[in-house]
């Protein structure tokens, strides 16, 4: 359990960064969280940290436009990556986000693993697939977390999991976690898997 290693409730937003000159300058391990807009990234962060609104959840997707660094008990950081695939953002803006995300993922020595969130209800989007392929290409460790599991009857979980894995061309060596911020399904497994990568 995570509590044995760190006080998960001792968490705060540290800073927001647009480029590497703004990144924290130390060697704390970092876990990046990526996913398309409205996949439930903020809810995932809040559930893991046992907080209601540390990460701001928004009904307006595409709100996170910077890399948000969260300090967790001075032992590790979560890095909330801007949600991708939001239609109402201009192409220029999207390209800017893409560059910012890529710079962080490829150059950041502190980065230990990326939690890539997908919506359990649907097949992965082209952006989801592209993100997974990008991480595999650069050999960045990745955990797939399928959110909103409470919206799917348990009897259909296997079908949805198989479908997502097939579309992603999922590597069996990677972790796949079924998660719900509503009933906390996958909470312990998420922490155990993240900590095993640090």
UniProtKB/Swiss-Prot annotation:
CDD domains: YihA_EngB. Coiled coil: none annotated. GO terms for cellular component: cytosol. GTP binds at residues 35-42, 62-66, 80-83, 147-150, 179-181. PROSITE patterns: G_ENGB. InterPro entries: G_ENGB_dom, GTP-bd, GTP-bd_ribosome_bio_YsxC, P-loop_NTPase, Small_GTP-bd. The keyword Disulfide bond does not apply. Its cofactor is Mg(2+). Pfam families: MMR_HSR1. The keyword Acetylation does not apply. Mg(2+) binds at residues 42, 64. It comes from the Bacteria. Keywords: Cell cycle, Cell division, GTP-binding, Magnesium, Metal-binding, Nucleotide-binding, Septation. One of its GO terms (biological process) is division septum assembly. Residues 27-198 form the EngB-type G domain. One of its GO terms (molecular function) is GTP binding. Belongs to the TRAFAC class TrmE-Era-EngA-EngB-Septin-like GTPase superfamily. EngB GTPase family. Necessary for normal cell division and for the maintenance of normal septation. NCBIfam families: GTPase_YsxC (TIGR03598), small_GTP (TIGR00231). This is Probable GTP-binding protein EngB. It comes from Streptococcus agalactiae serotype V (strain ATCC BAA-611 / 2603 V/R).
């Amino acid at each position: 359990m995570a509590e044995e290693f760190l006080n998960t409730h001792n968490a705060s937003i540290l800073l927001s960064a647009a480029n590497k000159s703004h990144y924290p300058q130390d060697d704390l391990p970092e876990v990046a969280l990526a996913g398309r807009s409205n996949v439930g990234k903020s809810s995932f962060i809040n559930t893991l940290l046992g907080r209601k609104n540390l990460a701001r959840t928004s009904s307006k997707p595409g709100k996170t436009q910077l890399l948000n660094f969260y300090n967790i008990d001075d032992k590790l950081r979560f890095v909330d990556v801007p949600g991708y695939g939001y239609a109402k953002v201009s192409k220029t803006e999207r390209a800017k986000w893409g560059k910012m995300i890529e710079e962080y993922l490829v150059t950041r020595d502190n980065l230990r693993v990326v939690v890539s969130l997908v919506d359990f209800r649907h097949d992965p989007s082209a952006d989801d697939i592209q993100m997974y392929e990008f991480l595999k290409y650069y050999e960045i460790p990745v955990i797939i977390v399928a959110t909103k599991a409470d919206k799917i009857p348990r009897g259909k979980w296997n079908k949805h999991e198989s479908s997502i894995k097939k579309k992603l061309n999922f590597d069996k060596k990677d972790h796949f976690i079924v998660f719900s911020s509503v009933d906390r399904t996958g909470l312990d497994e998420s922490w155990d898997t993240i900590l095993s990568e640090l």
